[in-house]
Every structure is written in C-alpha cells, then in structure tokens.
Amino acid sequence: MLLQFLLLSLCVSVATAKVITGVFNSFNSLTWANAASYPYRGPATPTWTAVIGWSLDGATASAGDTFTLDMPCVFKFITDQTSIDLVADGRTYATCNLNSAEEFTTFSSVSCTVTTTMTADTKAIGTVTLPFSFSVGGSGSDVDLANSQCFTAGINTVTFNDGDTSISTTVDFEKSTVASSDRILLSRILPSLSQAVNLFLPQECANGYTSGTMGFSTAGTGATIDCSTVHVGISNGLNDWNYPISSESFSYTKTCTSTSVLVTFQNVPAGYRPFVDAYISATRVSSYTMQYTNIYACVGAASVDDSFTHTWRGYSNSQAGSNGITIVVTTRTVTDSTTAVTTLPFNSDTDKTKTIEILQPIPTTTITTSYVGVTTSYSTKTAPIGETATVIVDVPYHTTTTVTSEWTGTITTTTTRTNPTDSIDTVVVQVPSPNPTVTTTEYWSQSYATTTTVTAPPGGTDSVIIREPPNPTVTTTEYWSQSYATTLTITAPPGGTNSVIIRVHSSTNDESSESTFSTLSVPSFSGSISIVSTVSRPHYVNSTVTHLPSSSSKPVDIPSSDVVTSTNDNSLTSLTGSENGKTSVAISTTFCDDENGCQTSIPQGSVVRTTATTTATTTTIIGDNNGSGKSKSGELSSTGSVTTNTATPDVPSTKVPSNPGAPGTGVPPPLAPSTETQTTNNVPGSPNIPATGTTDIRESTTVSHTVTGNGNTGVPMNPNPALTTSTSLTGATNSATNPSHETGVNTGSGGSTNIVTPPSSATATVVIPGTDNGATTKGQDTAGGGNSNGSTATTNIQGGNNEPGNQPGTNTTGEPVGTTDTQSVESISQPTTLSQQTTSSLISTPLASTFDGSGSIVQHSAWLYVLLTAISIFF
C-alpha cells in the first residue's frame, strides 16, 4: 500500500509539472578576466562572467516546474562544474544544469528545475554567476559558421532569453591583433569531448591562388587526428577574429591519416581564402608540437614554401579518473521544444565510457498561409519521433478601400487607416485641388494640329494651347449700290474655309450732267492757256477735245437698261440705259493705226460705259489689248486709259455708216494727220511713276451718231470731223511724250468707273478703281512702224476743213501698275495746271473740254473762247 501511494504521488507530481518563464529577469553585469596570456579582450578568450538576477514565486512556481536560460553565441562554461543551485538564505529553490554548446549547438543553456523547497506562500530572489566564453566561429562546421557573425569588434549587445523574457547588456570586444592577411592558427578545447579543434589558413593572395598545399601533422607527438571531422573549404571573408564566415566548395585533393591531413588545391579566385580544420585528441601529454605544411603560389607570382611548426599545450581530463576514456556522443529525438545536452551518470571507478546525450526536439517545418482577417493563428500537426512535425501559421491581411479627396495643399498625401476590428483598411489620398484651365486656339504655319498643356503650380492656372493649321481662304468680289468699297473677312472654325468678301461700287447709277453748247464764230487763232493748280492728284490723264461743231441740246430716248458686254478682239456691243432720269447713248469707238487703218473695234477686256442728258458724254476704259485678261460686267482692267467725249445729239440716223467718209454717209472721211503738235507742260505735284513695260495705246473715239428710241444708232450728228481724244497710258519719266509724268494706268480696286459731270464751272472727277487681273495693254506705233511694244501713244489733233496735223510718236517702255486697294469716288472742284497749246483753222469753235491732271473734265464755256479770240487778234 505504501509503495502504491509513493508511485501515485510521483505520477501526480510529474503530471502536474509545467514550464514556467521569466525566472531569469535581469542582466546585472558582464565582465572579462584574462584567464591566460591573451593579447586582447576578444569574445572567444576566457573568461567572461555574467551576473544574472532571478526570482521564484510560489504563487506561479511549483516543485517540478522547469525553466531555461538560453545563451546564444556562448561557446562553453569555463568551470569544472556541471550544475549550479539557485540558493537564497541558504535554501536551494532550484537546481540548474550547465549545458555548453561547444560544436553541438549555436547556444549554451542553463536548464533548471524547481525543488520542493518552493511552497505557495514562498517567494525567493537572488543572483547567479556564470563564467563562460563566447563562440565567434573557428571551423567549417555549420555551428561555427553561424556563430562567426554573432559579433563584431567594438560595442555589441548581448541578449539572453528565458522563454518570452529577454535580458540584455552591452559589451566592448577588441579586434584580433593578428593581421588577417597573415597565416591563421587556432586550437580550441572541447571539454565534453576532451578534444581540440585545430584550424589553419595560409597567407592571403589578393589576386587569388594558382595552386597550393596546406595541412598539418601530429607525427611523433602522441596526438591523433579524427579524419571524420575534417572540414575543407574556401571563405569569401574573415570576421574580426580571423575566422571564416562562409565555406564554399572548390577544386582540391584531400589526404588524411591519424597523424596528418594534407589538401592540394588549384585556382582559388581573388577574395577567397582556403582553410582546413580537424579534431585533435591529445591525451597523456602536457604539450604537443604540430608540423604545418604551407606551400602556395599566388596569381602572377612564384610558388612559396612557408611550412612551419607550432607547439600547443594540452591538459589532462580530471573527470574520468583515468586517461584514455572513450567519450560517446549520442543524439536522441524528444518531444521537447528545445535542444539540450546532458551527461549520463558515470562512475569512473566502474564505468569506462562516458556518454554525452544530445536531446534534440522533433524537427518541424513551418508553413505560412494568409487569409483576410484580423488575428494570427497557429496550428501544429504532430509527428512521432523520427518524423517531421508541421506548424501552420495563418497570417491575416487586410483589404483596402481608397478614398480620394481634394485639399488646399500643394502635394499629394496618402494615409492608411488600419481597422483593428475589421479586415478592411481605408487608404485616404488627398490631392491638390485642380487648377483652372484656359484654352487658347491659335494658327501656325505647319500642316498639322498640336495641343500643348502647360501645368502651373497648385493655385495657378493651367494653359492648353491648341495650334491649328491655317484655313484655306476663298475671296469673293461682289458689287453693291454704295459709293464705297468694303472688305469682310469671315473666319471659320479650324478645319473650315475662311471667306473674304469684297464689295465694290456698282456703276449702274452713273450720274450725268447737263451742258449746253453755244456756237461761236471766231477767227482762226493760235494760243495757249495755263491754269495753275493748287491741289495735286495721284493720277494724271490729259486729253483735249477740239473743233466741236455747233449744236443744240435735245433729249435722247434711251431704253431703260444698262448692259455692258465683254468684248472679243474685234468688236464691242454696248447698250446703256437711263435710270433715275438719266439718259445714255450708245457709242462706237474707232481705233486707228498706220498698219491696219481705222477699225470699229475695241481691245479685249475693255468696258465702255456712257451717260448723257442733252449732251452725250462717253467714257471709255481701255485695257488688255493683247487678250491676256477678260473683263466682265462692272470690272476694269489693271491697265488702260480713260477718255471722255462730249457731243450734242443731232438728227438720228437709221444706219451706222460702215465706211466713214464715203459719199452719202454723212460722215466725212478721216483727215490727214496734222503737223501741229500738242505739248503738255509738267504738272507740279504729279507723281513720278517709273517707266513700265506696257505698250501705250493711241486711241481715237469718234462720236458720229446717236441712239434711237429703241437703242439703234442713227445717222451722224454733224458733218464735221469727229471728236478725237487721245490719252497716253504710260510713258518714260520726263520723256518727250510724257513730260508731266502723267499716266493712265489703273491702280485702284476692281469696279466700274463712276463719272460725275458737274456744271461747266466745276470739274468732274473720274476715279478709276484698280483690279487685280494684271492685264497688259498693247499699243500701236503711229509713226508708221507697225506694232511696237513700249511706244508712247501719239495725240492726233485733227484739224478742221481738212487741215493736216500730225505728231510723231516716241518709243518708251514701262511696267503695268496694279493693286487691289479700293478708291472711293469723290467729286471735288480744284483748278489744275494744264498747259495746252491749241491750234485751229476753224472760225467757229463752240466748246473745248479737257481732262485735268487729276482726271476731271474741264469744260470751258463760251466766254473763254471769246477771250482766246481776242488774244489771237493781238498776237
């Protein structure tokens, strides 16, 4: 019964034991004491002593509970003790085992069990002192390579852990005094194995090694080499205490015996160091000497043999009681969560084998998954000893929703608001308020469109510049009733067609004037009249009308129509009607030259328009004799002359004579040219127009018939020679034929000529709008040389009673002048300078009519001829 009770109590205590944490709760100090003649205070040089605080509370700790202090990067405890008690006030509350890591694990540990001294109403606190050395590598094993990067020279933080409680302190480690480029030697004692780890690295070759042989031998020393523990590799770096931090394979050949190990290698790249290490057993000797083989050839250098010997001090194992015991290391898988090292009970008197057992937890693999949620969950799939358990970690993640808003700042901000209770977080994006935009459309010379956006800083105004190719333009000329010209431009949207509408004055309402001619009987006279002008005009056309017959004014019945027909090379048909009480007559124009004689024709492109009341006034615009341009209703040629003939209608005739001067026609034949010459003085203020390449025209306009009631022409109005006028279109500057620099070239815009005939005391103004057809007039050479470009028209003064008169022509050149400017029609009475020499054998001269320098008609009344007669008597 008693035995059953004891067994039951043991089972209950085991079943109720638990793992507690947080017993070691403070890192009070960490100091170093030189345990030998070490030249520097390195982490692997003994002895480092840590003072750790602990506390046990009976409320949470019970007998049999366990707790552990893990000490990462600690190599071994520097003591012969295998355990230590936690004592307070002379009482032991826990017993702890000292588990050195050595080459087995990356950490040492202190594992403790609460004793029965601890009761529920007891609380104990105290400190424990632990001597040890740190592990910073020293071989090619996985444990040493991991620990080779635990610390660096200088200030470091050392941290120990008791479950989820961590305690830390800082420490200052000194760097090795051996140059890293020199050969490196190391021997470390493994107390639990009574062995030493020997490491060798040859000198550094900065550019790499071509070949070499490295190794060591224990021949003659009694020490043996464990070939199963040999590591060979190359490292791409050393830590501050000259231990390899990595191990990579390379091309080598290894030879190992119980007394020596040799490694021959080739082609080690730059930046790498070859090394070899092995466990050495050195028992029953106080010291032993090692022979090191060190032969190497650096890249680009000759082979070097730097082999040497070195003596290491050994020690005797005091635990076995006898030397030469066998130490067996076994590994056993347990269900614990940490790895532990334990020594099985050993009696040196009876046991020859000391067993060190490594308790390794069941290996586990961790699988991390994720889900939309808030908390992290863990689940473990257990496995029996010898298999691998699985730990599944389910990590939550949140989805996000983005909210964008505007603000007055100048930058974009993004803020994530994490929801602690839900899986949806909010991302708030604040963007600057948009700038206002101004769009400008402009035209440029390219054939394609572009859009440029200029973004201003926040708070400014953005600009969008649209560049469009230019629209095509269609120009239309229209005629209207106003007396002035206008130009209207209609700009279409991009891609359309712009329109330019030019409205010019239509001459359908040409005005007329009334004049009564008186017949004066005056003797033959010869004289000159000079009228000085005070106003200059831009254009000058001089014509003289002489030897007008006596006639009386009478109305002429004209159809109410106004039709101007474009002409061909040989003829012109003109019907002019009466509007607003104005009367018109049809006029036939005769052109004469020495080669072809006189023909009733008009050059192509010319327009004849006439208006009259009691006195018939004919205005002829002559242009484009070579047929290069066509005129239409209301248009004028860019070059030409304007002549005005005034006559009084007489008895109508039923037929237009086709052969002037033939018997029975009533029209005298053309007289022979007069030898008298008309001269023109220079007009002050007249424009100096350069010579042009246009041929002047000699033009004679003959009024020899009237218009009947139905528009047909009648018989000649008088038997006297026809009214003859002549206008020089162009002439060379200061030439004999154009000394006054006068020209008849049209320079205005296209349109009809509006002739305003004022009373006899006023001046009628003829304004010739220009056109843009660029027509050129071809003249006749009246000197008998035929057609000649560049000749100046000759004024033919036809004398009365078959009195001859002739003026030879002079050749000159010039250019046509044309423009599209519009000139208005204006009636102004201004005296002009006009030098005119008149020679006549007629006794009766009713009236003379001339163009002044500005193109106005000057009608001289009867009293002027009386004055001329008186002057001729005196002279």
From Swiss-Prot:
Changing I125M: In allele ALS4-2. Pfam families: Candida_ALS, Candida_ALS_N. GO terms for biological process: cell adhesion involved in multi-species biofilm formation; cell adhesion involved in single-species biofilm formation; cell-cell adhesion; hyphal growth; single-species biofilm formation on inanimate substrate. Disulfide bonds join C73-C150, C96-C112, C205-C298, C227-C256. GO terms for cellular component: cell surface; extracellular vesicle; hyphal cell wall; plasma membrane; side of membrane; yeast-form cell wall. ALS repeats lie at residues 365-396, 401-432, 438-469, 474-502. SUPFAM superfamilies: Bacterial adhesins. InterPro entries: Adhesion_dom_sf, Agglutinin-like_ALS_rpt, Agglutinin-like_N, Agglutinin-like_N_N2, ALS, Fibrogen-bd_dom1. Its main location: membrane. A lipid is attached at D852 (GPI-anchor amidated aspartate). N-glycosylated and O-glycosylated. Residues 549-578, 627-641, 722-746, 789-816, 827-837 have a biased composition (Low complexity). Belongs to the ALS family. Cell surface adhesion protein which mediates both yeast-to-host tissue adherence and yeast aggregation. Plays an important role in the pathogenesis of C.albicans infections. This is Agglutinin-like protein 4. It comes from Candida albicans.
